[in-house]
Amino acid sequence: MIDKRRPQRDLPKINERIRFPEIRVIDSDGSQVGVITPKEALSLAQEKELDLVLVSETAKPPVCRIMDYGKYKFEQEKKAREAKKKQHTADVKEVKMRYKIGESDYNVRVNQAKRFLKSGDKVKATVTFRGREIQHANLAQELLERMAKDLEELAEIQQAPKREGRNMMMFLTPKK
C-alpha cells in the first residue's frame, strides 16, 4: 500500500514503482538477463524472494537489478556513515605570542602548531604588539619566518607574515 501523505517521487524506485515500458535486468549474481518488461522482471524477482531495484534511470533502457533491497539500503547507509567519518573539516587554530617570547615558550608554541597541523587544521600564528612595541614589526616578522622554517616539513605558508592593526599574522596549511 502506498502512503498518500508522502509524495511518490521521494520513494526509491523498487518493484511496482518502476514505470518504464522495458528495462535491462541484471540478476542477483551479476549476470545480465536482458531487456524485458518490468512485469516479467518483477515475477523473476519474486520467484527468488528478492526485490527489483532501479539502479540507473538515465540509461537507455533503464537498468534494474534483482537484489535484497533491505541489505542494499543498509550497505548504502553504511558507506555514507564511513564517508562522513573520514571527512574532516579543517579548522583554523591560532597560536598567539609576543615578539619578545622566551625560547622555551617559543618551543611550546611550535609544538602546539605541529599538533594542529598533524590533525589537519590550519594554523594562524599571531604576534601581538602593545604600546610602542609596534616599532619592532621587523622582529615579529623574523619570529614568524623562523616559525615557518621550523614547521616547513609539516606546513606550507598560505599567507606570508602581514601586519593588521596591532597584530602581525601568518597562515600555515598542512602539507598533503
UniProtKB/Swiss-Prot annotation:
Predominant cellular place of this UniProt entry's protein: cytoplasm
Domain of life: Bacteria
PROSITE patterns reported for this sequence: IF3 (PS00938)
Record has Protein biosynthesis as a keyword: yes
Keyword annotations from UniProtKB, A to Z: Cytoplasm, Initiation factor, Protein biosynthesis
Disulfide bonds: none
One GO CC annotation: cytosol
Pfam families documented for this protein: IF3_C, IF3_N
Chain coiled-coil ranges: none
Intracellular or extracellular location(s): Cytoplasm
GO biological process, one term: ribosome disassembly
InterPro entries in UniProt: T_IF-3_C_sf, T_IF-3_N_sf, Translation_initiation_fac3_CS, Translation_initiation_fac_3, Translation_initiation_fac_3_C, Translation_initiation_fac_3_N
Example GO molecular function: translation initiation factor activity
Quaternary context: Monomer.
NCBIfam families with a match to the protein in the record: infC (TIGR00168)
Function according to Swiss-Prot or TrEMBL: IF-3 binds to the 30S ribosomal subunit and shifts the equilibrium between 70S ribosomes and their 50S and 30S subunits in favor of the free subunits, thus enhancing the availability of 30S subunits on which protein synthesis initiation begins.
PANTHER family hit by this protein: TRANSLATION INITIATION FACTOR IF-3, TRANSLATION INITIATION FACTOR IF-3, MITOCHONDRIAL
Family from the record: Belongs to the IF-3 family.
Protein name (Swiss-Prot/TrEMBL): Translation initiation factor IF-3
Gene source species: Rippkaea orientalis (strain PCC 8801 / RF-1) (Cyanothece sp. (strain PCC 8801))
